[in-house]
């Protein structure tokens, strides 16, 4: 969930280089906004604007502080440098795990993402 379509769209497209897949006005207050990461033809993200106080209270903590979004890359160094260049908050620096190289980043609302370059054989 997002506070504002415009600010969320700007963050994901300008800082993470996502592209717009669909933007349909459903009502004066509601849009169907779908974005996708670079090379993410099989993956997309719906930007759903919080509509109630309860929903707004959960923005940025929809999973109780756990990582729940995973951004796969074929070039970890390039994409990690982009995160740094865009001044995106890194909450856990890169580490090499048995399954690949991973760092944890925070989006504009505090949601946690893994940037991960999986090991091909894993």
Describe every region a protein language model picked out:
Residues 2-5, 26-28:
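Conserved beta-strand-loop-alpha-helix junction that forms the acyl-donor binding cleft
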Residues 8-13, 83, 110:
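Conserved active-site tyrosine of GNAT-family acetyltransferases
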Residues 19-72, 80-108, 116-122:
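Vicinal oxygen chelate
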């Amino acid at each position: 969930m997002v506070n504002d379509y415009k600010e969320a769209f700007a963050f994901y497209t300008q800082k993470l280089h996502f592209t717009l897949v669909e933007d349909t006005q459903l009502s004066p207050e509601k849009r169907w906004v779908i974005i996708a990461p670079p090379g993410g033809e099989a993956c997309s993200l719906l930007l759903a604007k919080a509509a109630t106080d309860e929903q707004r209270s959960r923005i940025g903590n929809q999973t109780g502080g756990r990582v729940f979004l995973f951004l796969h890359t074929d070039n970890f160094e390039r994409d990690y440098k982009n995160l740094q260049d865009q001044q995106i908050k890194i909450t856990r620096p890169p580490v090499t795990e048995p399954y690949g190289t991973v760092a944890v980043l925070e989006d504009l609302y505090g949601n946690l993402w893994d940037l991960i370059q999986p090991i091909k054989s894993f």
